[in-house]
């Protein structure tokens, strides 16, 4: 837009063109996915996050955000009753976690890490250099997901150019992806 608009016009457009077609995740009768910012605390947290929104991708870019992520990761580990080896504050510094903006972002990051780890392991085993390993092995990698997995699994495989095999799970086994299913 080259010229500003009156706020009433902006809100009218928002009401007519956005709100009419939106799925209202905050509606008390919406059970399709997961709760959103429906509480006072959630709204306040969103407001504070928006006020300090900056690229928190590493400590140099945003020390406060990175340190806060470490504190929150420890809180979650403690709330889940995980051993201290999972804590960022553990002296060995082997613990920790990351906070992502979405399931898709976390799935993609996990798959990239798994892909790179697999390619490195192949290089170690075969003695091939990294470029040869990528050329030879990248198209052979397969990502496995259960038929109950989040849609971000298939999306991630497509983004990374990986084969994706969807494997069945059953209620009988509490929808767990089992070793015998993977071996087939």
What are the residue ranges of the model-derived segments?
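Hydrophobic alpha-helical scaffolding
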Residues: 4, 34, 62, 100, ...
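Secondary-structure capping and boundary motifs in well-ordered enzyme cores
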Residues: 40, 64-65, 99-106, 145, ...
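PLP-dependent aminotransferase-class I/II
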Residues: 117, 121-127, 131-184
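C-terminal structured subdomain/cap of oxidoreductase catalytic cores
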Residues: 66, 70, 74, 111, ...
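Glycine- and acidic
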Residues: 52-60, 86-98, 135-140, 163-171
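N-terminal entrance/gating region of PLP-dependent enzymes' catalytic architecture
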Residues: 1-94
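Conserved beta-loop-alpha segment that forms the PLP phosphate-binding cup at the N-terminus of a helix
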Residues: 69, 73, 89-137, 152-156
């Amino acid at each position: 837009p080259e010229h500003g608009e009156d706020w009433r016009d902006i809100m009218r457009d928002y009401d007519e063109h956005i709100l009419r077609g939106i799925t209202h995740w905050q509606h008390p009768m919406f059970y399709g996915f997961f709760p959103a910012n429906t509480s006072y605390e959630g709204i306040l947290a969103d407001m504070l996050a928006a006020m300090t929104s900056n690229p928190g991708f590493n400590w140099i870019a945003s020390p406060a955000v990175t340190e806060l992520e470490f504190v929150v990761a420890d809180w979650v580990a403690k709330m889940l009753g995980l051993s201290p080896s999972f804590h960022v504050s553990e002296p060995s510094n082997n613990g920790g976690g990351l906070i992502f903006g979405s399931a898709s972002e976390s799935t993609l990051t996990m798959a990239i890490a798994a892909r790179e780890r697999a390619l490195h392991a192949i290089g170690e085993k075969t003695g091939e250099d990294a470029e040869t390993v990528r050329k030879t092995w990248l198209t052979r990698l397969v990502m496995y997901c259960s038929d109950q997995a989040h849609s971000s699994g298939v999306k991630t495989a497509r983004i990374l150019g990986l084969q994706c095999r969807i494997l069945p799970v059953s209620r009988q086994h509490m929808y767990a992806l089992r070793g015998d299913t993977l071996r087939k």
